[in-house]
Structures are given as C-alpha cells and as structure tokens.
C-alpha cells in the first residue's frame, strides 16, 4: 500500500463543515465593504522578491526570516528571477496600481481577499498559509478616511457579534523625519541599557529599533517605561492629523486607547497606526491592524500618493467569532430537499427541481440521489439542514402534484406542481 501524502505543515485543509462557517463570515465582511463603495482587486500570489524587500523593509522579520522565496528561469532566458509567495497584500496592491495607472491623480478604494504565506512556527491562529482581507485607499490624506476605515471595521464587529470582545489601540508614528529623530533618541537610550536587553532586542537596536517597543519580554517592557516617548517627537502636521482622527472617532462613539508603543512590524507605515486586539485568543491578540503609508507608492516607483489601509487574518477572526459568539452558525447547506420514491419518479423529480431553481433563484435545493426509502431520504434532508422537503411519489407524479412538508413544524400540504414554487416562496419568507 502506498504511503499517504499529508498536507504541508502549517498549511491547512478546511473541510465543508468549516468552510460553511467561513462563507458566512466572508459574506458579512464583503457586504459591509461593498456598502462603503470599495472595489475588489485581485493580484497574483507570486511577486518578484525585490517588491517585498523594498516595501516591507530588508531588516524586518518578514523579509529576513519568513518569506517563501525561490529562483525561477524562463525556458529561453538566461537570467534567473527571484520570486516570492506574497507574505502580505499591500505591496502587490500598490505594484498593480502603479503598473496599470490606477493611482495617477486618482482616488482609489480597493479591497482584496486571498491566501498569504509566511514561514513561521505554526500555532493556533498563526499558520504558514493564511487568508487575509485587506482594504487600501489611495489619493486621500485627511484623518477622515483613516476614521472611516476604522468605522468600517467597527461595523464588522457589530455584524459578527464580537464588538464587546475587541478593543482599539491607536498611535501616530509621525513623518519619516520625525521618526528618524525619535529613532536616534531611542537608540541612544537603548545603548545606555544594553545589558538589560535580550539578544533579539540587541540585534534590532541598530537594524529596526522601533521594533524593540513591542518586545514581549517583561524586563524589556519595564525598561521601556523610562524610554523617550514617541509622541514627544511628532511633527506638528502629524499631531494635528492624529488629533483630528481622535475627534472623529469620539464623534462616532468608537472607544480607543492611545498606545505609544504601537509601531507595527512593517517599515512602510507613517502617521496613523492602529490595531484591534482581543483577550479571547490567548497570545494571538491582534485581530486587525493597519495604518497610513504615504511614502510607499513613490518608494515603489510611482508618483507620491497618500495611502492608508489595513489587513485582517480570517483564520484568527473565525476563531474569535466561534469563541465568543456560540450562536453564530453556518448557513444551512440546503433550504429544500426533494424526496423521490422509486426510480420511475426520478425523471419527474429532476425536472421539477430544475423548474424550481429557475423560479426560486438564490434558494438552495438538493435532489435525492442513490435511492433509499422515505425514512433514509428524510434523514438526508435533516443532515443537510433543509427546512422543507418536497415529496414526489408515484401517485403525485400521476396526478401532477407534490407534497410540501415543513420539516420544523411537521405540517405538510399537497400542492399542484405548477404552484409549488409560489407555495415554497411563502414558506421561506
């Protein structure tokens, strides 16, 4: 017997019982996004490696440790090209916008959803292949669009029933110049206390010192209580931008906490950064995160363009929804199950099923196949979550009727086949 081949570590299969829950979550997410006027963009999962090095930063953990990268060669070409499975969605979205002229003096509001890849240690809520939804806005620089993105996410939480289990953390990391000044002050402070830093922080101190601020080491966190505050180094425009954002959120009734150690892990951010966090998923507390990246388009070869966006991991979101909202169930696979007794009734049953699909668009109808007595067929209807059974026996076929049975109340009615669709429409509401 041949050896079974298993899935790659950290890359999961999602079986029908799981994908049904995912699909309901995704429907809610998409409905909210589209209600705000965003348009979907789809980009490749493979990009040239320099895109991520330039966008994310060469000394970030993502680029240094976590990317799936390989060399590729066209059949007739001598040049080897380095390609990478996308670890995040913003860089590819910006690349596509520049390449196709979407960002030239234009406002764009885009969203995307799909798999991303990072070579991390797999654990609950963090996998090597994971799925993200992201929103990106180009061409708008005021705090009002930052606020709208946060309001949109707050609407998600309400629709998913998790509002009481997520909290918003905000910060401003200022302009590139202000952040450079703060970086120098932070490095000077860390050098004075180098003996108190762990090896990871010592490495980051010179390569990416702002990442020391979100160290999980309790001793480092205690040391940082005396470190220079990022807020003291903000330029005036960034202060005004952040104050405007806070005022808009307060007007919308969205509570937040200012966290001056919130910096995000990617180099392209400036000014606004934010995270929605939860205490309901253990150590994996971040549910959704993003911020402003006004310099990235120019950095990747386009014209200077204001930009802001965020991304959310769907695995973590589904875990949270299921953990805190037990009433959240997958939509039924089937609304109506068509029961047919005997092979002689099957042609009529299948013809009726097709007619009902024509007359009831959007209704999920499954026809019984494989025979079986009525008891077995009603058992299958229950397994698929059907609310209603339409029953065709030999007598119904002969006289042009069908029995419509409400599987919740047990009530059933004989209906002319030409009237079955109207009767079902009434029952389904």
Curated annotation (Swiss-Prot):
UniProt KW keywords: Aminoacyl-tRNA synthetase, ATP-binding, Cytoplasm, Ligase, Nucleotide-binding, Protein biosynthesis
Q: Where in the cell is it found?
A: Cytoplasm
**Chief site of localization:** cytoplasm
Known EC number: 6.1.1.21
Q: Which reaction does it catalyse?
A: tRNA(His) + L-histidine + ATP = L-histidyl-tRNA(His) + AMP + diphosphate + H(+)
Q: Which Gene3D superfamilies match?
A: Anticodon-binding domain, Bira Bifunctional Protein, Domain 2
Q: Which InterPro entries match?
A: aa-tRNA-synth_II, aa-tRNA-synth_II/BPL/LPL, Anticodon-bd, Anticodon-bd_dom_sf, His-tRNA-ligase, HisRS-like_core, HisRS/HisZ, HisRS_anticodon
Q: Write one Pfam family the protein is assigned to.
A: tRNA-synt_His
| Gene Ontology terms: biological process | histidyl-tRNA aminoacylation
Q: What class of enzyme is it?
A: ligase
The domain of life for this entry's organism is Bacteria
Q: Name one GO molecular function term.
A: histidine-tRNA ligase activity
State any GO CC term: cytoplasm
The entry's family comment says: Belongs to the class-II aminoacyl-tRNA synthetase family.
How does this chain assemble? Homodimer.
HAMAP family found in the cross-reference section: His_tRNA_synth
Q: What is this protein called?
A: Histidine--tRNA ligase
**Species in which this protein is naturally found:** Escherichia fergusonii (strain ATCC 35469 / DSM 13698 / CCUG 18766 / IAM 14443 / JCM 21226 / LMG 7866 / NBRC 102419 / NCTC 12128 / CDC 0568-73)
Gene that encodes it: hisS
